[in-house]
């Protein structure tokens, strides 16, 4: 599967409808973004079962702001509607493969449990347990 252009109009639906979504926040004027693009495209072909989205931060400033994107490129991975990875910087192919493998290996029941515990603690005004 090739990459999908994500906009504020299709972002939520894409994340809701797919179990595993990678998101590349980028801009056309960004040199590292242009260097990362072929690496990302190749990974999208290798992992055709996953959705590889791209957010043009110039055209989708509202979306970039909603995620607090401060530098580009930034790669984010969302599994089961939970952001499980977010990191600025262009990754080499090997590092991208490693990150995808780690995200695939996550026990999402544990992730959802940790999120629920953190939200409950936050609702009580407590700090989440850093040890998880």
Residue ranges of model-derived segments:
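A short beta-strand-turn-helix
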Residues: 3-21, 61
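Conserved helix-turn-beta segment immediately C-terminal to the redox Cys motif
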Residues: 18-22, 35-55
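Short pre-active-site segment immediately N-terminal to redox-active cysteine/selenocysteine motifs
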Residues: 19, 26-29, 71
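Structural cue for short, hydrophobic secondary-structure segments
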Residues: 24-26, 77
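The canonical Cys-X-X-Cys-His
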Residues: 30-33, 75
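Structural micro-motif
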Residues: 61, 67-76, 91
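Non-catalytic, surface beta->alpha helical segment in thiol-disulfide oxidoreductase systems
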Residues: 76-110
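CheY-like receiver
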Residues: 108-126
């Amino acid at each position: 599967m090739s990459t999908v252009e994500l906009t504020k109009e299709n972002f939520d639906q894409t994340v809701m409808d797919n179990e595993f979504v990678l998101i590349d926040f980028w801009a056309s004027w960004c040199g590292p973004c242009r260097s990362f693009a072929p690496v990302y495209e190749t990974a999208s072909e290798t992992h055709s079962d996953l959705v590889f989205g791209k957010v043009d931060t110039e055209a989708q400033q509202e979306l970039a702001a909603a995620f607090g994107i401060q530098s580009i490129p930034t790669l984010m991975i969302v599994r089961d509607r939970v952001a499980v990875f977010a990191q600025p910087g262009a990754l080499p192919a090997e590092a991208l493969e490693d990150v995808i493998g780690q995200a695939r290996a996550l026990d999402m029941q544990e992730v959802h449990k940790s999120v629920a515990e953190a939200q409950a603690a936050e609702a009580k005004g407590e700090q989440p347990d850093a040890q998880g």
